[in-house]
Amino acid sequence: MKVPAPYAWNSDFATTYENIDSEHRTLFNGLFALAEFNTLTQLNAAIEVFTLHFHDEQGQMIRSNYVNTKEHTDIHNGFMDVMRGWRSPVPQQDLLAGMAWLANHIPTEDFKYKGKL
C-alpha cells in the first residue's frame, strides 16, 4: 500500500477491530511525531507505543488461537529490533522506512486476521 500523505491512519487501514484500529492510529501518530520532532523523547515514545500495541495484538491472537500467531510475532520482533537500533536523531531514511513498514504491514499482514480474532 502507498504511504499516506499526510502520514496518518485512515479507513484504508481498518481491521474491523476497534481496539486494534485505535492502537494503529497511535502508531501512525507516534511515527509522525518522531519524524516532526526527532528527539530522544519522541523515539522512546514511539518504541513504547509499538511495544504495547504488539503485546496487545499478539495477546488477542493467542486468545483467539490465530493460526499465524508465531509468524506474525516474528515480524513484529524483527521491526522492534530495527526500532531499538535507531538513535536520536533518527536518520530520515530510517524514518521513511519505518513509516513505509507500518503502512505496508497493516494491509499485508494484519488484514490476514480479519474475522479470525
UniProtKB/Swiss-Prot annotation:
Transmembrane segments: none annotated. SUPFAM superfamilies: Hemerythrin-like. Keywords: Iron, Metal-binding, Oxygen transport, Transport. Fe cation 2 binds at E57, H72, H76, H105, D110. It comes from the Eukaryota. One of its GO terms (molecular function) is oxygen carrier activity. Gene3D superfamilies: Hemerythrin-like (1.20.120.50). Fe cation 1 binds at H24, H53, E57, D110. Belongs to the hemerythrin family. Octamer composed of two types of chains: alpha and beta. Hemerythrin is a respiratory protein in blood cells of certain marine worms. The oxygen-binding site in each chain contains two iron atoms. This is Hemerythrin subunit beta. It comes from Lingula reevii.
